[in-house]
Regions:
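Hydrophobic, aromatic-lined core segments that form the binding pocket/scaffold
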Residues: 1-134
Length: 134
């Protein structure tokens, strides 16, 4: 993500905050945080929708929005990789926000995270190209 063009002034500091929250205490703390976040998501619904469904719908969006573009550049794998990587990044950002808020995450916060990520990725042809060729 640090190879992307930063479109908003605070995007890099947002990435740094997420990185510190998730990985700052080491690998074992990261695994414990992810375990607790998974348990939280298994019990919690966000505006009536489970986290699995949210992530699935985001994957459908990324595939639907970009897969057909492979007709022009023959980069089918890149389009799918970008979809998978985007879901992974968003999940990590959700976990970081949840941890920063002492185990709380709302549907509105999920929306904000997805919106900000989408703005950084999709409003730059350079960023789309980088994500499709990682």
């Amino acid at each position: 993500l640090y190879e992307l063009e930063f479109l908003s002034e605070d995007w890099e500091s947002n990435l740094n905050r997420c990185k510190q929250t998730l990985y700052g205490e080491g690998i074992e703390a990261y695994h414990e945080l992810q375990k607790r976040f998974q348990e939280y998501c298994a019990q919690e619904c966000f505006a009536g929708v489970s986290m699995d469904i949210i992530l699935e719908q985001l994957a459908v969006y990324f595939v639907f929005a970009y897969f057909c573009g492979a007709v022009y550049d023959d980069n089918v794998i890149g389009k799918i990789r970008m979809a998978v990587d985007s879901i992974t990044v968003l999940h990590e950002m959700f976990a970081a926000k949840w941890a920063e808020q002492d185990g709380s995450l709302s549907a509105k916060e999920i929306q904000k995270i997805v919106y900000r990520y989408s703005r950084e990725l999709e409003h730059s042809d350079l960023n789309l190209e980088v994500m499709q060729n990682v």
